[in-house]
Amino acid sequence: MHTEGEGSKESLASREERILNFWKTQEIFQKSLKNREGRTLYSFYDGPPFATGLPHYGHLLAGTIKDVVGRFATMDGYYVPRRFGWDCHGVPVEYEVEKSLNLTTPGAIEDFGVAKFNEECRKIVFRYVDEWEHYIYRVGRWVDFSATWKTMDASFMESVWWVFRSLYDQGLVYEGVKVVPFSTKLGTPLSNFEAGQNYKEVDDPSVVIKFALHGDPGSLLVWTTTPWTLVSNMAVAVGPEITYVRVADKVSGEQWILGQGCLSRWFSDPDTYEVIESFPGTALIGKSYEPPFNFFEQKRAEGAYTILPGSFVEESEGTGVVHMAPAFGEADFFVCKEHHVPMVCPVDNHGCFTEEIPEYQGQYIKSCDKGIIKSLKNQGKVFYHGTVVHRYPFCWRTDTPLIYKTVNSWFISVEKIKDKMLQANKKIHWVPEHIKEGRFGKWLEGARDWAISRNRYWGTPIPVWKSKDGDILVIGSVEELEKLTGEKVSDLHCHFVDQLKIEKDGKSFHRVPYVFDCWFDSGAMPYAQNHYPFENQKETESGFPADFIAEGLDQTRGWFYTLTVISAALFDQPVFKNAIVNGIVLAEDGNKMSKRLNNYPSPMSIMNTYGADALRLYLLDSVVVKAEDLRFSDKGVESVLKQVLLPLTNVLSFFKTYTDLYGFDANNYDKEEISYSEIDRWILSNLYTVVGKVRESMSSYNLNTAVNPFVTFIDDLTNWYIRRCRRRFWESADTPDRRAAFATLYEVLTVFCRVIAPFIPFISEDIYQQIKTENSLESVHLCDFPYIDLAKVFPDLEQRMGDAREIVGLGHSLRKEHKLKVRQPLANFYVVGPKDRLDQLDSFKQLISEELNVKNIVFYKEAPSFVKTTVKPNFRSLGRRVGEKIKDIQKALASLSQAQIQQLLTQEYLSLNLGSEEIVLHMEDVLISWETDPGYVARSSSLFTVVLDCQLTEELVVEAISRELVNKINTMRRNQKLHVSDRIVLRMQTSEEVRKAFLHYADYICEETLTTQSEFADVLEGEEWDINGHPTVIAIEVAARPH
């Protein structure tokens, strides 16, 4: 009888809000912490977000991962503090203020006033903090908002100063001039890892310019995609080992010089030119040339405009001759510095030409490309002009093109500690594992010195005070600054400390005009969050390195990296032990999620529609937890709800329906007296196997392998155990079998809700609250995570049940393929497979028979005479690989014995001996089919072949009608929302065939539908049905209860 309700009618959003309110009012999170005080500390670092924007799926994903691990560790007995922190400084905040105050021109902030600007930044830092807290609260994540740390707090900033001073004391800090990524929109340098965060495909000019040689009739052909840098050209480089050619135009006689390997790239028609000579690159070194522009002709006397050797020069692109503007290229800078070539930088911090380039003064450099090319064309200096599509770095915050530019900056000597960083990385357990030697390891190998100073305002000021003659003082604490200035210091932002002058040794010292890269703030977070070393030394050191950290893949070049730099430098050890790296959540179309494009649903609407548990499980059970990108689909979340969570809710509803009906008391039964059936022992064995798998996966931080076992178990529970055991729960008498069924399902729910609690905390709490007893703890989240009960684990039973389910699955596939309803009984079902496996399935014959609705089951160790499995070559797969041998393979496959075919199915490969050659075939190389006698159909898996006898007798047809009637009547019971115990009166208007079937199977039909009275009518108002081709009208009503 299929009439129990489908779970609570309470909406998901209402249920989750109810549970959230329960956690809040009863302070369950606080109690979970208090219960573990004094236990082993489990520490993790939580990457601080900016509260100037709303959370997106990436934040919720990383937060969910952290929540799962934190909940599991707590349930596993650890004390897991979960302080939240906020990133308050830097470009994200400043940029928002600039937009709101319309401070768009160079110098606008200074004109507005730095102090006023910084205070405006302070005001908006927590613009969306309430929304952030609500999102985090709504997704079911537990964090402590009562003790948040903020990068703008004086205590945090003082610890950042301490970190900087410690690095300085180790000789790891220096001031220098280098070519670094530079945001002209922000007017500040960026770090190399920031520059790598936002590459785009762009169209840029591709031009080849003629540089006339002095004392030589030829011109060098020089390629560039940045024409604006040509005004700053100081040298060209050639490869000493490269062979160069002199080419003459057959008509004009004009001569050009370029790399021999580049010749075909620029000269496609050999009839238009001739190669006059070839020579090594060394023959060009030292020659002088005429630059494309003469803005800096005076620099020739200082060594400009000569040809230099460059080992970096290649012929894979361009011309083999490289234009060098040392102020705008890293390789250019070092080569020119090595050869004492002067440098010019006629570009200001906003990307505009200075007065040194009067023709373009005040104009943005990229907008001058066209004018520069036009000017060169007018001078006859352009050999080629086209466009090129290539990847180019953009500012990660303003989405404007970056340039590379020489700036004066403060650097951390990362290259000095590279080996320490690599050694630290070896001690970290990364998930997925390939991050260690792959993306993160390779980034560490290529680590460069870190430009940590920014020409900005709202940030932690770099604590360096400098005198006019260049002496410096590096301050490491507030106390030290107060002693040197004689002033009380309460705020460390620049508009306060820049007013402080230090007088020492007869000199005046003023602070340098830079703030820290905000990544330096967050890299110092493990220490600064606790005001270390000024306070909380024991707390900080006991939690270092962190047990766990989790962020997105982009943080391998961001926060993971900056944390590692500082930790390796200060302590020569990793800053965290275990790391989970997630991929990026993209829009469903594969593009980046964009508010402007409106190409994704809001997270809050998803949670209110499908529930936070569904969103959590959708993310956790996807490739995104393996550092792969996920195309977000609300249909995917809906699928998780319908296929996983609702069935689990229905199990609870089923259990509650019958325990309430029959009065099962969880406090009042003796487990020792329960006589468990085989299927009870199977589901309990399966349960504790899942416990072991989840524990093992969580211990190794593999969330994707932790989720799959319990998701699969839900299917095992709902679509096998409950379905197979319904009748046991229906028993009106208090039989040992019914008690065993109740006891089994109660144990499953009590253990399983603890297994799933870290992952889907709402539904686990709902289950727990509805089945807990007076002796239970207040919340499932105050319970211990279960351990595997080895006394209840039976691997052989799990294997046997797995085999039975595999056989049933094959049978159902055949029925579906050949359009044979399961309600249509069939006479015979044959199973072919290994004898040892089939021998163990004798006790499951009845189960298989009932599941497939067949009368008779026969096991064979070899295929019966009426079925033959055939194997043919898959020409599409094999054709290219084996060529003409395909005919020999076809013959060999045709001659395979049934035993050899079974070996292929079992091993999923087969070796064929073709004379002198052996060829290995895999499943994708062959096509499997089955030849059967008329009336039979067959299908195989790796272990079993099943054959279904499809021949229908009159008796089978009549029985099918009776089963169809039961199905339709019980559907009407559900639709009319009858109670599971309601008896009914049944009336029908139907054909003679259906009438006969009903009368023949009346006892069965009445028992299955709780029918106490039935009658037939010639005319009837009711619901119309098709009963296997017989139009039938059925009406039901609740029978009068006896007094």
Curated annotation (Swiss-Prot):
The protein's Enzyme Commission number: 6.1.1.5
Primary site of residence: cytoplasm
Signal peptide residues on this chain, from the entry's feature table: none
Database matches in PANTHER family: ISOLEUCINE--TRNA LIGASE, CYTOPLASMIC (PTHR42780:SF1), SOLEUCYL-TRNA SYNTHETASE (PTHR42780)
Required co-factors: Zn(2+)
A Pfam cross-reference name: tRNA-synt_1
GO CC terms of this entry: cytoplasm
GO molecular function, one term: aminoacyl-tRNA deacylase activity
'HIGH' region, short sequence motif: residues: 49-59
Motif segment ('KMSKS' region): 592-596
Keywords linked to the UniProt accession: Aminoacyl-tRNA synthetase, ATP-binding, Cytoplasm, Ligase, Metal-binding, Nucleotide-binding, Protein biosynthesis, Zinc
Domain of life: Bacteria
Keyword Iron-sulfur: no
Reactions catalysed according to its record: tRNA(Ile) + L-isoleucine + ATP = L-isoleucyl-tRNA(Ile) + AMP + diphosphate
Binding site for ATP: K595
Entry's family note: Belongs to the class-I aminoacyl-tRNA synthetase family. IleS type 2 subfamily.
Location in or out of the cell: Cytoplasm
Domain notes: IleRS has two distinct active sites: one for aminoacylation and one for editing. The misactivated valine is translocated from the active site to the editing site, which sterically excludes the correctly activated isoleucine. The single editing site contains two valyl binding pockets, one specific for each substrate (Val-AMP or Val-tRNA(Ile)).
Job description of the protein: Catalyzes the attachment of isoleucine to tRNA(Ile). As IleRS can inadvertently accommodate and process structurally similar amino acids such as valine, to avoid such errors it has two additional distinct tRNA(Ile)-dependent editing activities. One activity is designated as 'pretransfer' editing and involves the hydrolysis of activated Val-AMP. The other activity is designated 'posttransfer' editing and involves deacylation of mischarged Val-tRNA(Ile).
Complex formation: Monomer.
First-tier enzyme category under EC: ligase
Protein name: Isoleucine--tRNA ligase
Gene Ontology BP, a term: isoleucyl-tRNA aminoacylation
